Amino acid sequence: MKHKPIFLLAVIVLLSACGQSYEEKVRLSRAERARLAQEEAAALKVAVLPTLDCMPVYLAKQNHWYDSTQVDLRLKVRNAQIDCDTALKGKSVEVAVTDLKRVEHMTKHGVGLLTMGPTDAYWQLIANRTARVKTAAQLGDKMVAMTRYSATDYLTDKALDGVKTSAPVFRVQINDVLIRLDMLKNNEMDAMWLTEPQATTARMFKHTVIEDSRKMKEHLGVVVAGAHLMKDKKRVKQLTAFVEGYNRACDSLNHYGVKHYADLVKAVCHTDDKTIDRLPKYSYPHIALPKQR
């Protein structure tokens, strides 16, 4: 019994120490979260899709082809263009690879954007082989997957302009490019607009190309940034470093070809070797800030 007070005191001291340790951990955890949030806010965040037009961003990031003392480059991967644009509108990213029709839509809604340059993105309207559709005129009473207020919406208008169909064409908003392709594979959609490499996969499965944005003379891919960034010297330095890395990646892709980076394409586009082997030639133009043009 003589040792009982000593034992109780030891337990109290131990519990007190544990309590202090827990409080310290909570404090450090909050400090760490605050530090990470600050770093995230200061970084240059770029919204990208699992598509070939975004390859210069992926490649520049993988190989660190930019001045890391000037920019902490972070990629925000989304499967839907509309999600990239929402992030750009909400300023949770600074740069996005998008299309001119999405840019027009955002601009109309008060989003200030800076166009940095075009991409070589193109879209093909591909009909499910089971739908027996070979021309736009045969799309009556068929479902076409697209995204509202985007290149695919605009291209649908253009494809149907002056065309008589037997019944209305049903536009179905399927924003996720990977889900869109899966719906074609599973015969859940009659037709859809796809860019690369998803378009190549669709062609590989013998689905029918009925329209092509290149034949329509429409070049709609673009890289944009928030216009407000040009008022911030640090952000301008970040953008300058990003542009240098992006253009270096373009040069490498144009020189070696996108198939040279098959492992990266498979990883970021969620595709396979068979699709990559069948990819057509794809070119990558440089981008620039306005003062650099």
Where are these regions (language model features)?
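Short, glycine-/small- and polar/acidic-enriched structural segments
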Residues: 22-172, 183, 190-196, 210-213, ...
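Proline/Glycine/Serine-rich low-complexity intrinsically disordered segments
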Residues: 130-137, 161, 167-170, 181, ...
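Periplasmic-binding protein-like
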Residues: 118-127, 204-235, 239-246, 281-286
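Sec-exported extracytoplasmic/periplasmic mature domains
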Residues: 62, 89, 108, 161, ...
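C-terminal motif of bacterial Sec signal peptides marking the signal peptidase cleavage site
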Residues: 16-17
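Bacterial N-terminal signal peptides that target proteins for export
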Residues: 1-7
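Secondary-structure end/capping motifs
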Residues: 232-293
